[in-house]
Amino acid sequence: MTDLPAQLERVHMVGIGGAGMSGIARILLARGGQVSGSDAKESRGVLALRARGAQVRIGHDAGALDLLPGGPTVVVTTHAAIPKDNPELVEAARRGIPVILRPAVLASLMQGHRTLLVSGTHGKTSTTSMLVVALQHCGFDPSFAVGGELNEAGTNAHHGSGDVFVAEADESDGSLLQYDPNVVVVTNVEADHLDYFGSPEAYIQVFDDFAARLSHGGLLVACLDDPGSAALAQRVAARGLPGVRVLGYGSAEDADGAFAPIDGVEVGARLLSFEARDVGGVLQFQLAGEQAPRTIRMNVPGRHMALNALAALLAAREAGADVDEILEGIAGFGGVHRRFQFTGREHGVRVFDDYAHHPTEVRAVLGAAADLVSQPHEADRRESEEPVRSGKVIVVFQPHLYSRTATFAEEFGHALDLADEVMVLDVYGAREEPLPGVSGALVALSVSKPVHYQPDLSQAPRQVAALASPGDVVITMGAGDVTMLGNQILDALRAAPHHHPSR
């Protein structure tokens, strides 16, 4: 039995192993659909889908459309990652099988639910995941589709029994305008994906258009620390959309007078302080209408994560969850795969991995790392006979996409200056062909801190191990295959003679 629309009963997905596509496949399977798909290579996501009954072929050919008895009722693909001459898309056109994009499927799956959607240039996955975990702790069983794997759930998607659906609303190709949300969270708005939008103005406009799709009685939750999302909140509040409320959150030096409206935007929560502790931190904040501040301990690092927690709190409260229980859930949130994820520790060197691939994300992660080096790991304190000094931040950065590297090379360089030592790898091109003169060296030229350009990925682990000392934090950073270097760096640290490089 299936409760799916007829078109989604037998679905073939091109690029099924990707973060967004695999999540949709999980939900389709859980709702009784038949799913087939193809991907360029084996992955954990592909193996997990096969275990749930999906028929997946590695490589792309027209015969993949025959994996399901009777063939697919629809073929699903992503906006840009799949070339139009893909043999499966060509065969679908020949057979007259409709080809639709992933967001159209997600919009269909969300019908009949109260939808809580998280958008913004950065922080979508972490905030969405925090919101899901908080609601689950409160006894909700929401459906969700997230761009990363929740550490608690070990999955990026779920078909829940409740009437709430939580999802990321990806703005990269404007497809978020297919959704009709009840609650929208906007973490920040900063020009990106200009290869698609063409101008910063067009990129910003898509958020205005998205907010305009809020249903009557809906809520826009926006970060007031970010100029882009604050301006969006002001525009929406001034426009007076029928039945739509606007609620801001952000930083304040103290609680006194912190809840006066800011440029017409009501303030719902204020971050009073964030103090780094080991691999997490202590967050003090105050909610509008409450007399006293609240304090919670978080298991994820960085002031940006503290702000994300306030966004998740306000959205979960709007869904009907109890504030105290929401905070318990947020306190237990263990993070998302590849979002400042702890890889391991060797000889007093802590290694983390992060997906950051935009200058603002790089700055946020390196700021959190700087807090960490002033807070040595408890194990280092126990193992050292002498006080453990604070260390340095070493970042191994892999630029993602030639177009983004060409646009932001100088900004990446300035952002990487927040580290003490920088290694820049070559560009991970993903779907793009190389651009003349664009490589990791372009980014390295804009770094003023000690920098190493290393185009040979295989040489990086040994080189990083030679740079690191006890107390240091190493971060592998980028949206490509740099993630595989973390464990290799730990292996290199184990193999290296115990040494203390000069600083």
From Swiss-Prot:
Task: Provide the reaction this enzyme catalyses.
Answer: UDP-N-acetyl-alpha-D-muramate + L-alanine + ATP = UDP-N-acetyl-alpha-D-muramoyl-L-alanine + ADP + phosphate + H(+)
Which pathway does the protein contribute to? Cell wall biogenesis; peptidoglycan biosynthesis
State the HAMAP family in the record: MurC (MF_00046)
Q: Which InterPro entries does its entry note?
A: Mur-like_cat_sf, Mur_ligase_C, Mur_ligase_C_dom_sf, Mur_ligase_cen, Mur_ligase_N, MurCDEF_pg_biosynth, UDP-N-AcMur_Ala_ligase_MurC
Task: Tell me where in or outside the cell this protein is found.
Answer: Cytoplasm
* Protein name per UniProt: UDP-N-acetylmuramate--L-alanine ligase
User: Species name for this entry?
Assistant: Rhodococcus opacus (strain B4)
Q: What does this protein do?
A: Cell wall formation.
What EC identifiers does the entry list? 6.3.2.8
Q: Among its keywords, does the record have Ligase? A: yes
